[in-house]
Regions:
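Low-complexity intrinsically disordered segments
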Residues: 35-113
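Compact beta-rich and alpha/beta scaffold cores in large eukaryotic transport/transcription complexes
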Residues: 17-42
């Protein structure tokens, strides 16, 4: 069974962005990975820019994205951007996510949905 999740982040320049991730959203994996590998602002920005993902790896290059997969349109999998972190995450929500992980520019937080 998939543990679906969101990543919502405050980006460089103050904007906020959000993506959906399909697998491995349980805190023992997702929060640990984000805290270990995505605490550099530039890397967090790059993660959001990938768009929706199947899974997130410990390096950007290891993220399995939906982009480029047959039948996937960028319009459907692109990040949602805006000025308010919670509002961006709420707009991007698919409805079946179990967790939301947020980056405020300093640290990661987890919310069970």
């Amino acid at each position: 069974m998939s543990t679906r999740w969101q990543i919502a982040a405050r980006l460089s320049g103050g904007r906020c962005g959000c993506i959906y991730v399909h697998f491995d959203g349980y805190p023992e994996h997702a929060l640990r990975t984000l805290q270990a590998a995505y605490t550099d602002q530039k890397i967090s920005d790059q993660l959001i820019a990938l768009g929706d993902c199947r899974s997130v790896g410990v390096r950007i290059e290891e993220c399995d994205t939906f982009s480029g997969r047959e039948g996937e349109k960028w319009e459907d999998i692109k990040p949602t951007y805006g000025d308010d972190l919670k509002a961006v995450a709420d707009v991007h929500r698919h409805g079946d996510e179990n967790y939301r992980y947020t980056w405020d520019g300093r640290q990661w937080a987890m919310e069970q949905l």
